[in-house]
């Protein structure tokens, strides 16, 4: 029998319904795995007592044949989802001891459907990073190793703790957030399915903000079916979020294994012109061939303004961050640095200097600069205009195709210290994920192959607004085509 912590969400639900094991046994298997691999630093807060209490309640519901859709399923939450009575830090010193008195809508949705929370996962500070190396709790180490080197690798970022937890069988599923690729890129690096729904599908209420016009909750799982199950539980209109979309939550599970007949797949050839590793290019070509053989029609498309995505993103996102993070002043909550006879301005300065890490300070400074009166027209407003052009490119493409397929990241996972001193190179890791974020489109990363060094590589599927169904359909087809490949880190 498969170890309980290695079961997918779907298989866990089936086993619990069949009474093959209890939720408490399932949770304990995950707790054992978490304790065994604490060196990966995936979790920053463990909630084992809560999980066991929730598991006992789940077992009672199964005994009474009244299970909810996620009854007894162990999950983890990125540490920017506010959890009532449980520390929520965004992995920043400025919030290191913050305990919210309310619950985020997304975690509440999962609790309402029977989910069991194992803990809060590590992340880049305020979700700013692509390698999970900016956390005040230290780096996250990927469960994966290259076959020619024993060096520690990054799990990607900013949702690296969630990716490491699911990839290392320390959670059945894990919540992440995706602003410019923070679910899709880590999923690519760790051999997982990472899904970011349409902007507004999941409530942002109770999520610590980075860039409000881009932030969206996402999910890590080990199968496409699991993604569909979790998304159905997470999504839905929320009056507490002004950006929430009033749209019915679709039935998504029927997308799995459905026919690719009459599906047109767009391939943006202009995005493969540079900065992409040969292994990634080969897997991209193999994936297109796989979809063609499955009955899809392949259509070459051009996204003319996507190449400006990174530049646009690193104007808009820091601008929004500088505004959002102005609330951390040491007055109302979070860290406060004090000394005798200090002025209010000195308290602000000392608190923010001590509370924010270097990457967050860098982005606040960039954001403040581009919003200044001298630069607003030249940078911020121009970036917003180009963002609209990027969105229009997608609208034009989707008049001809049903989905777009391209890599989730231009490289395989890299060593922990390899790129941290060059932020520009780190920013370019989101080259393929940022355009869809700027347009607010649903997208997923799906494991599509292994590099020559035995590391997972993910392909990204981008869909039309509110068309999570077709994204899952294409992802499921790719998943079926590579089922002979074992996306499992050695030793786990």
From Swiss-Prot:
**Catalysed conversion reaction:** L-glutamyl-tRNA(Gln) + L-glutamine + ATP + H2O = L-glutaminyl-tRNA(Gln) + L-glutamate + ADP + phosphate + H(+)
| A GO BP entry | translation
Domain of life, per the record?
Answer: Bacteria
Show the GO MF annotations.
Answer: ATP binding; glutaminyl-tRNA synthase (glutamine-hydrolyzing) activity
Report the active site residues: 78, 158, 182
Keywords per UniProt: ATP-binding, Ligase, Nucleotide-binding, Protein biosynthesis
Quaternary structure annotation from Swiss-Prot or TrEMBL: Heterotrimer of A, B and C subunits.
Q: Which NCBIfam families match?
A: gatA
Family (UniProt): Belongs to the amidase family. GatA subfamily.
Please identify the protein, giving its name as recorded: Glutamyl-tRNA(Gln) amidotransferase subunit A
Q: Which organism is it from?
A: Rickettsia akari (strain Hartford)
């Amino acid at each position: 029998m498969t170890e309980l912590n290695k079961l997918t969400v779907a298989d866990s639900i089936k086993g619990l319904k069949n009474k093959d094991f209890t939720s408490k046994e399932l949770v304990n298997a995950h707790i054992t795995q978490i304790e065994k691999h604490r060196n990966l630093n995936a979790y920053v807060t463990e909630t084992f007592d809560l999980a066991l209490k929730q598991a006992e309640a789940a077992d009672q519901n199964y005994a009474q044949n009244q299970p909810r859709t996620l009854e007894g399923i162990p999950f983890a939450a990125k540490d920017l989802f506010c959890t009532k009575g449980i520390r929520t830090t965004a992995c920043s010193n400025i919030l290191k001891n913050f305990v919210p008195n309310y619950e985020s809508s997304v975690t509440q949705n999962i609790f309402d459907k029977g989910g069991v929370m194992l803990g809060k996962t590590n992340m880049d500070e305020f979700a700013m990073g692509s390698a999970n190396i900016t956390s005040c709790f230290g780096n996250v180490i990927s469960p994966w190793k290259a076959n020619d080197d024993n060096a520690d690798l990054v799990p990607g970022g900013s949702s690296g703790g969630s990716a490491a937890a699911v990839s290392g069988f320390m959670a059945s599923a894990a919540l992440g957030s995706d602003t410019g690729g923070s679910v899709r890129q880590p999923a690519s690096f760790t051999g997982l399915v990472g899904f970011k729904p349409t902007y507004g599908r999941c409530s942002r209420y109770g999520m610590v903000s980075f860039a409000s016009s881009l932030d969206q909750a996402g999910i890590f799982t080990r199968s496409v079916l699991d993604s569909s199950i979790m998304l159905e539980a997470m999504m839905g209109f929320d009056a507490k979020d002004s950006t929430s979309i009033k749209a019915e939550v679709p039935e998504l599970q029927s997308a799995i294994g459905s026919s690719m007949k009459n599906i047109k797949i767009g391939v943006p050839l202009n995005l493969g012109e540079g900065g992409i590793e040969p292994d990634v290019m080969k897997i991209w070509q193999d994936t297109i061939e796989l979809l063609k053989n499955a009955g899809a029609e392949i259509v070459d498309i051009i996204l003319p303004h996507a190449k400006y995505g990174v530049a646009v993103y690193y104007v808009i996102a820091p601008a929004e961050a500088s505004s959002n993070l102005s609330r951390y002043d040491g007055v109302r909550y979070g860290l406060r640095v004090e000394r005798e006879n200090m002025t209010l301005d000195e308290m602000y300065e000392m608190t923010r200097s001590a509370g924010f890490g270097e990457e967050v300070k860098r982005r606040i400074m960039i954001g403040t600069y581009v919003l200044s009166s001298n630069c607003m027209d030249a940078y911020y407003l121009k970036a917003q205009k180009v963002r609209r052009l990027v969105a229009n490119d997608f609208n034009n493409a989707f008049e001809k195709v049903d989905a777009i397929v391209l890599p989730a990241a231009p490289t395989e996972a890299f060593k922990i210290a390899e790129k941290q001193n060059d932020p520009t190179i780190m920013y370019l890791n989101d080259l393929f994920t940022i355009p869809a974020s700027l347009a607010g489109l649903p997208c997923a990363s799906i494991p599509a192959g292994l590099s020559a060094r035995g590391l997972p590589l993910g392909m990204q599927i981008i869909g039309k607004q509110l068309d999570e169904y077709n994204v899952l359909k294409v992802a499921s087809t790719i998943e079926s085509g590579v089922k002979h490949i074992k996306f499992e880190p050695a030793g786990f």
